[in-house]
Amino acid sequence: MEIALLSLLFVVYLVFRYYLIDHETAADKDVRRFEKGIQLVKDRKIETAFDYFNDAVLKNPKSAVAYAWRGKCQLNLANHHSAIYDLTQAISIDNTLADCYLDRGIAFYSVDQFTEAFREFDKAVWHIRDERPDAYRWRAVARIQLRQISQAENDLRRAVLLGDEDAFQLLRQPPFTRPQPVKSKR
């Protein structure tokens, strides 16, 4: 009887603990905290958003989200090396932010560091899984630069299956197009 009562109390304790404990990660809390700046980026007010996230980084130097969004602003302002720095800082604080890998890969690609870009896109594909096709498309573009054409074609086909129209357009261009055989009339 005592064991049943203790088991029941333990289950009640677990239920209360589950519902009363905060389940948000630090990144989720930061996204909510920096909602104003994120909206500025979405509204394409990049300079204002950069100032916002620059202040956020100064006030919250341990915030991966602040570094990540400042890095995204740097990328949009074509400050690729600064973007790489900010995104590297964000990843060193929280290595689960998938967009950081994608953005850092784009920054590496923009400065013609294709091997590093491919590595970042590969990590982005792993983190994003099959939720967004742009990681597959960017990995394919980096693979083209590295002369990995067949793997690039597979990535582009995967991106097309996920709904990426840009990947479809890339598949219609060389080196993926094959010439049609010429039929001669005799």
Protein language model features and the residues they cover:
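Alpha-helical tetratricopeptide repeat
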Residues: M1-R186
